[in-house]
C-alpha cells in the first residue's frame, strides 16, 4: 500500500478535503501506526478559523490508537503489531517543565494535527505537524504508549481527553467531599470530568449546559454522586446580563462551590460561574473563552479566588487514565457515542459542529 486516505486542511476551515496522500515512511526514530480509531474534536475547526495552524496543508487530528505497522532503525521498545495509543503532544523533554511533570508548559509544546502554542521555532512540530485523521500516522517512537488488551481502540483514542479532565481536576485541588460545578457538561470534556469525579473525592456535582435532557443523560455518568443540573434554556431570557446563572448556582450551593471546571468556549457562563465559587475556591478554565471576565481584581482578592488556565494534560495524566482503565477502576465505553468511517469524515466534522443530537465523544474508524 503506497497511498492512504487522510482528512486535510489546505488553507483554512473552509478548505477541508478528504484525499489520497502517500503512506508515511518511518525515520530512524519513528514508528508508523495503522490508525484503528481517531478522536474528533470541535476545537480543530475553531483554531483553523483563527489561523493557528503553522503548517498548511496538513492532516488533522490529535487523538488516536492503533497497531504499529513500521519501526525505524533506531526506535526501541516497540515492535510491529504492538497495540498502542499515540501521545501527540510534542515537547523538548529536557526543559525544567518537561523534567518536573509539567510538560504541557514546555515552550516547544505543540500538538500533531492541531496547533502550536506560541510563535517560536518548533523543529519537532515542523517535522510532525501531520495528524491522525488518516489510515496511518508517523510519530516519534517515544510518543506511543502500550495499550492494555482490556482497553479498546475507541476508548484509547480518547485517553487524551480524559487526561485533560484529570489535569483540570488536579488543578482544582479539591478537598474530600467537595462540590464542583462543571460547565459545558454535555461535551467531551464535561462528560469525562463527570465520569472521573468520584476518583477525586467529589460529593456533589452541579452540571451546566443548554438543555436539561442532555444534562440529565450526563448526570447518569456520575457513579452515584448526587447531581443537580442548570439548563441555560430554562433561565430567564436576560440571564446573560442579569447574573441569573450566578444566582442559580448560589441557590444550589449556598456556601459556594469548591471549584468550577469550565469548558465553555465563549460567552458569559465563565464569569457568572466564577461568582458561584466559594471563598478560597478555584475556577479551572479549558475552553478557550475570549469573553472578558466581569470580576475585578478586587473581587478575586476579597474572595481569595484562584483562576487557573490549562491547555493540556501531562503525559503522566494520560498514563494515569490508562492505569484506571486497565484495572477496571474506570470504564469509558459508554462515553463513545458516535462512530464514523474515515470515508465520511466530512460528515463527521459537520455533525460535531452542529451538535443536533447528544454527542459526548465521537471517533472516526479508518
What is the predicted role of each segment?
Residues 1-4, 271, 315-366:
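C-terminal hydrophobic helical "lid"/dimerization subdomain
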Residues 24-38, 50-99, 103-104, 148-150:
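Glycine-rich beta-strand-centered segment in the early N-terminal region that forms part
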Residues 92-181:
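NAD(P)H dinucleotide-binding glycine-rich loop of Rossmann-like/cofactor-binding domains
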Residues 164, 188-189:
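Hydrophobic/small residue at the entry helix of a nucleotide-binding pocket
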Residues 182, 198-268:
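Adenosine-nucleotide cofactor-binding segment
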Residues 184-185, 288:
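NAD(P)H cofactor-binding loop motif with strongest signal on the N-terminal glycine-rich segment
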Residues 202-203, 219-225, 264-329, 366:
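Glycine-rich phosphate-binding loop and adjacent beta-alpha segment
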Amino acid at each position: 500500500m503506497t497511498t492512504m486516505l487522510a482528512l486535510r486542511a489546505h488553507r483554512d476551515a473552509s478548505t477541508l478535503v478528504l484525499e489520497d496522500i502517500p503512506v508515511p515512511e518511518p525515520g530512524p526514530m519513528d514508528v508508523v501506526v495503522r490508525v484503528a480509531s481517531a478522536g474528533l474534536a470541535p476545537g480543530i475547526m475553531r483554531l483553523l478559523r483563527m489561523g493557528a495552524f503553522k503548517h498548511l496543508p496538513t492532516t488533522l487530528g490529535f487523538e488516536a490508537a492503533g497497531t504499529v505497522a513500521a519501526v525505524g532503525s533506531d526506535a526501541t521498545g516497540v515492535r510491529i503489531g504492538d497495540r498502542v495509543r499515540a501521545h501527540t503532544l510534542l515537547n523538548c523533554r529536557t526543559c525544567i517543565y518537561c523534567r518536573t511533570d509539567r510538560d504541557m508548559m514546555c515552550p516547544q509544546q505543540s500538538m500533531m494535527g492541531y496547533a502550536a502554542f506560541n510563535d517560536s521555532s518548533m523543529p519537532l512540530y515542523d517535522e510532525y505537524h501531520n495528524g491522525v485523521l488518516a489510515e496511518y500516522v508517523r510519530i516519534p517512537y517515544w510518543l506511543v504508549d502500550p495499550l492494555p488488551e482490556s482497553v479498546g481502540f475507541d476508548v484509547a483514542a480518547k485517553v487524551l481527553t480524559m487526561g485533560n479532565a484529570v489535569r483540570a481536576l488536579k488543578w482544582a485541588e479539591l478537598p474530600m467531599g467537595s462540590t464542583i460545578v462543571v460547565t459545558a457538561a454535555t461535551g467531551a470534556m464535561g462528560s469525562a470530568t463527570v465520569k472521573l469525579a468520584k476518583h477525586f473525592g467529589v460529593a456533589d456535582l452541579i452540571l451546566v449546559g443548554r438543555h436539561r435532557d442532555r444534562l440529565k443523560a450526563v448526570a447518569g455518568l456520575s457513579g452515584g454522586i448526587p447531581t443537580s443540573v442548570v439548563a441555560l434554556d430554562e433561565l430567564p431570557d436576560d440571564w446573560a446580563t442579569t447574573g441569573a446563572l450566578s444566582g442559580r448556582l448560589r441557590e444550589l450551593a449556598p456556601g459556594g462551590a469548591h471549584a468550577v471546571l469550565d469548558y465553555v468556549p465563549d460567552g458569559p457562563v465563565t464569569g457568572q460561574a466564577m461568582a458561584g465559587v466559594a471563598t478560597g475556591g478555584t475556577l479551572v478554565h479549558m475552553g478557550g473563552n475570549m469573553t472578558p471576565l466581569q470580576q475585578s481584581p478586587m473581587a478575586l482578592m476579597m474572595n481569595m479566588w484562584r483562576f487557573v488556565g490549562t491547555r493540556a494534560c501531562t503525559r503522566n495524566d494520560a498514563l494515569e487514565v490508562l492505569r484506571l482503565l486497565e484495572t477496571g477502576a474506570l470504564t469509558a465505553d459508554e462515553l463513545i457515542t458516535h462512530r464514523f468511517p474515515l470515508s465520511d469524515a466530512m460528515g463527521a466534522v459537520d455533525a460535531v459542529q452542529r451538535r443536533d443530537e447528544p454527542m459526548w465523544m465521537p471517533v472516526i474508524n479508518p
